[in-house]
């Protein structure tokens, strides 16, 4: 029994060793965005429309490429969600909201780690810092969804343009983020929200090709590890069957020897009588 478990564990670890490194070479940091984002609809419905959520908004989010503001934005979203979570006690009345916010916070925390590990280098950044603003739940989670959408684009194609506001662009007309379209939930943040259309078009053109390469990189090592796993399984089964066959033959031989010994013993006893 112990030998069987040892072989099974060995095969599993071998497949993991073959599969993980090859996939990680193609993926940036996996996909931390889970289906929990679908619960945003319920959360927004539970919160009062006039409830204000404080967020350090990254200036230039509407005019700069997403890689310029994504890293700072996910950090600020993480801080705001943590503050929001503290306002809901973990009791039956607020358990639903507490659970949803906690799950969304974990998603953003994973995005922060990913962006820290894969932040673009040698990029001239904008000197503007995040500005403290207050948003309704609908506005806040519109920004949340847009950041999620920008992260998905970042996974398939990383832009490297400088993050400096053009001198021809005037200051924002309002200190609040304008919400001109109805609140959209996953799939999040339509591409029309991006003013940098040339960057979006390049990403859209590269997305199918990069997605195909990514799936190929995932499927190929999985197939190889599956074949190797079956091969090890077949070898183990063959060895096990051979051992079982020899064991059965040995049992039969022992039984025959015992029967012969018993017959000889009875024959000697009969002769003595």
From Swiss-Prot:
Source organism superkingdom: Eukaryota
Segments in the Extracellular topological domain: 26-214
Low complexity: compositionally biased ranges: 191-202
Carbohydrate attachment residues: 90, 97, 145, 195
Function: Ligand for the receptor-type protein-tyrosine kinase KIT. Plays an essential role in the regulation of cell survival and proliferation, hematopoiesis, stem cell maintenance, gametogenesis, mast cell development, migration and function, and in melanogenesis. KITLG/SCF binding can activate several signaling pathways. Promotes phosphorylation of PIK3R1, the regulatory subunit of phosphatidylinositol 3-kinase, and subsequent activation of the kinase AKT1. KITLG/SCF and KIT also transmit signals via GRB2 and activation of RAS, RAF1 and the MAP kinases MAPK1/ERK2 and/or MAPK3/ERK1.
Protein family according to the UniProt entry: Belongs to the SCF family.
Protein name, entry field: Kit ligand
Species for this entry: Mus musculus
